[in-house]
């Protein structure tokens, strides 16, 4: 089956993001296709390059990035939610005349159209 996941919780502070990541790995291990992960609302914090957990903590942001590089899973974050929460890429930093970007490589700023497309092209969309 072809799946998409929507994550609405931050990398730390709630169980949503870590549960979504465990579900993503389980899907791939069972031979399913994970087309994309869409990060919405507080979920956009999963794409913050500046997140620095303690050395003895699980680095959820970097593990999402590995999901992209190792399995080709699209990691889309809602551009409107991201900008409201201070997550920007190089293009938006230039447009807004900000000194730097903080979007983790492997993540892409996207509109809600990416979520709509996933819901049309996937067999299941699971929200965390």
From Swiss-Prot:
Main location: cytoplasm
Key word Isomerase present: no
Organism: Salmonella typhi
Listed name of the protein: Sulfurtransferase TusD
Family to which this protein belongs: Belongs to the DsrE/TusD family.
Gene3D superfamilies: DsrEFH-like (3.40.1260.10)
Entry's Gene Ontology cellular component terms: sulfurtransferase complex
Catalytic residue list: 78
EC nos: 2.8.1.-
Assembly with partners or alone: Heterohexamer, formed by a dimer of trimers. The hexameric TusBCD complex contains 2 copies each of TusB, TusC and TusD. The TusBCD complex interacts with TusE.
Lineage: Bacteria, Pseudomonadati, Pseudomonadota, Gammaproteobacteria, Enterobacterales
Gene that this sequence comes from: tusD
Catalytic class of the enzyme: transferase
UniProt keyword annotation of Lipoprotein present: no
Sample GO molecular function, one term: sulfurtransferase activity
């Amino acid at each position: 089956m072809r799946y998409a996941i929507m994550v609405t919780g931050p990398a730390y502070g709630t169980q949503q993001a870590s549960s979504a990541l465990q579900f993503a790995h389980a899907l791939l291990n069972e031979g399913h296709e994970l087309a994309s992960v869409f990060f919405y609302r507080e979920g956009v914090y999963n794409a913050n390059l500046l997140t620095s957990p303690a050395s003895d903590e699980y680095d959820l942001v970097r593990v999402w990035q590995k999901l992209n590089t190792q399995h080709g899973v699209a990691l889309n974050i809602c551009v409107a939610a991201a900008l409201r929460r201070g997550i920007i890429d190089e293009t938006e930093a230039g447009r807004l005349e900000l000194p730097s970007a903080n979007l983790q490589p492997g993540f892409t700023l996207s509109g809600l159209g990416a979520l709509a497309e996933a819901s049309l092209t996937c067999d299941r969309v699971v929200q965390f």
